Amino acid sequence: MQSVDTTKYIIYADITADGIVERPDVVGAIFGQTEGLLGSDLDLRDLQKTGRLGRIDVQISSSGGKSMGTISIPSSFDKVETAILAAALETIDRVGPCMARIHVTKIEDVRAAKRKYIIDRAKRILVEMFDENLLETEQITEEIKQSVRVEEITYIGKDNLPAGPNVLDSDAILVVEGRADVLNLLKYGIKNAVAVGGTNIPPTITELCSKKIATAFTDGDRGGELIVKELLQVADIDYVARAPEGKCVEELTQKEIIRALRQKIPVEQVMDMYKIKPFTRKKREIVTKRKSLIRERPVSVRTVAQVVPIAHHAEIAPPHEIQTRVHQKEVHEHYEEPEIEGQEPEEWFKHHVEELDGTLTARLFDRNNNPIRDVAVRDLARELKESNGSVHGVIFDGVITQRLLDIAAEKGLDYLIGAKMGSIAKTPVGIKVITSGQ
């Protein structure tokens, strides 16, 4: 009897006979008519006894005086010997007293079928049996990370607000919604975040925002928008950053967090967008706060003719975590009101101002005052940085901020026309600054 484990190929053949024959007749004809045909090495009876040939399976039926059926023979020989045996079957021309014809239809490679089974089964094993162990490893890693983050989190003020360890010592803070947001920022090395703990803004937040440069960093949903609106009315917020639409700060990746903080919007522009009454403060007080915080830092001072960039407000922990270097440049000791160009805008200015009103869109112009393209106001700073000298003027439906002025001066723009004037510490020389209300 042929062992299933040693079978390499299975020979399949069809048989037809001009008369009534049965299985024993077919098997007898196979053994009888191939005996001595291929020599002693390929004698079917001897091969079956030694296990090189399997059991000959015959399925046959009779109808209308004729018999038809199939034959299958397992073989453990290699391809050449198996092909010889298959060809020998087709030499059989008689079964019992009847004329017969045998035709080999195919030779199946059993090992190929086994290989296919092995591949399919290995895939299932990989998914089903290794998945559980992988999850356990991830859970252990996450538990360790969570433990470290929980140890770093502190609670400040009378309200016991969850905060990063650097909130009290830092001159810039991130105001987020909840404890989970603080933990996620700690995960990526941002240690100057403090949570408000809901829409009811506690006094500790108001006090911190009055002393530090504060950036509100909220979820990209309706709840985040409501918190921003309340913060603007009760706290001295300087910038607003939002998570991508539909996402929460606690679930953001490192890349998404950095992108959101880089795209923060000055508070003046946000207040204009929401059309709400802001937290009461004078323009001079805003500038004084920011300048005093800058002077408190032990940084080397170097003179810069026109550009006064604003530092990043997310403190990143060194060195194994994200590093954000803050470069500070000289700021004038005394606040000076910006000298705004007092001339009436030309007619073509007015046309573009009216066209952009209420769209929160910026229009870039070339040297000949021809429009280049329109961009969203939130992307204006990035577009100017990447302009490479092609942009010579901008008209936009937004607030003219110190950051935009600095970038415009750095890129050599001739004019900057906005809807409103924000908190400006210094107007660069050589650039016309006009508001649409002039």
Curated annotation (Swiss-Prot):
It catalyses: ssDNA + n NTP = ssDNA/pppN(pN)n-1 hybrid + (n-1) diphosphate. Residues 171-245 form the Toprim domain. HAMAP family: DNA_primase_DnaG_arc (MF_00007). One of its GO terms (cellular component) is DNA-directed RNA polymerase complex. Its EC number is 2.7.7.101. GO terms for molecular function: DNA-directed RNA polymerase activity; metal ion binding; poly(A) binding. Gene3D superfamilies: 3.40.1360.10. NCBIfam families: PRK04031.1-1 (NF003108). It comes from the Archaea. Forms a ternary complex with MCM helicase and DNA. Component of the archaeal exosome complex. It is an enzyme of class 2 (transferase). Mg(2+) 2 binds at D219, D221. The gene is dnaG. Keywords: DNA replication, DNA-directed RNA polymerase, Exosome, Magnesium, Metal-binding, Nucleotidyltransferase, Primosome, Transcription, Transferase. Binds two Mg(2+) per subunit. This is DNA primase DnaG. GO terms for biological process: DNA replication, synthesis of primer. Its cofactor is Mg(2+). Belongs to the archaeal DnaG primase family. RNA polymerase that catalyzes the synthesis of short RNA molecules used as primers for DNA polymerase during DNA replication. Also part of the exosome, which is a complex involved in RNA degradation. Acts as a poly(A)-binding protein that enhances the interaction between heteromeric, adenine-rich transcripts and the exosome. Mg(2+) 1 binds at E177, D219.
